[in-house]
């Protein structure tokens, strides 16, 4: 899924989503939170995507039903990254890194290949390419 197959508009949107997500680094974790006062993982992803008029469900389980599955090696900026045990979601940034609301650290950027996340990674979800450009 090379990014050079994307339209300029889609590339721009994906980049903008990641830039927006990174603006909230340092915001604390709040169970059930979906605002800059505090986020849980799905509330954070839903909030960021909503800034671009993209409506996502509130839970990771429901987000998993949207878009198309993407293999780890095919992830591109703006894709969702899904984890199990426990269920968790973040936004893929680039170069093996993703942005998410961590229960212990709030909104941070982490490496997908860290032992903790590597063991729990289920797949990516491409939500954006299903939109019309």
Outline where the language-model segments fall.
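Catalytic cysteine-centered active-site loop
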Residues: 23, 27-77, 129
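Extracytoplasmic/secreted envelope proteins and their assembly/folding machinery
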Residues: 14-18, 22, 42-46, 121
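Structural motif
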Residues: 78-79, 96
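Aromatic- and glycine-rich peptidoglycan recognition patches
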Residues: 2-12, 54, 60-62, 69-70, ...
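Short, surface-exposed beta-edge/turn micro-motifs
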Residues: 77-78, 87-89
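Long, low-complexity, intrinsically disordered polar/charged segments
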Residues: 1-29
């Amino acid at each position: 899924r090379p990014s050079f197959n994307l339209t300029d508009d889609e590339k721009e949107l994906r980049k903008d989503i990641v830039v927006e997500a990174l603006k909230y680094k340092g915001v604390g974790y709040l169970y059930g939170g979906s605002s800059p006062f505090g986020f849980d993982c799905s509330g954070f992803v839903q909030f960021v995507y909503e800034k671009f008029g993209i409506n996502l469900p509130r839970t990771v389980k429901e987000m998993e039903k949207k878009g198309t599955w993407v293999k780890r090696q095919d992830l591109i900026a703006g894709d969702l990254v899904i984890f199990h045990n426990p269920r968790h979601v973040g936004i893929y940034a680039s170069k093996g890194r993703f942005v998410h609301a961590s229960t212990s650290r709030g909104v941070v950027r982490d490496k997908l290949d860290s032992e903790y996340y590597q063991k729990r990674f289920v797949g990516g979800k491409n939500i954006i390419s299903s939109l019309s450009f």
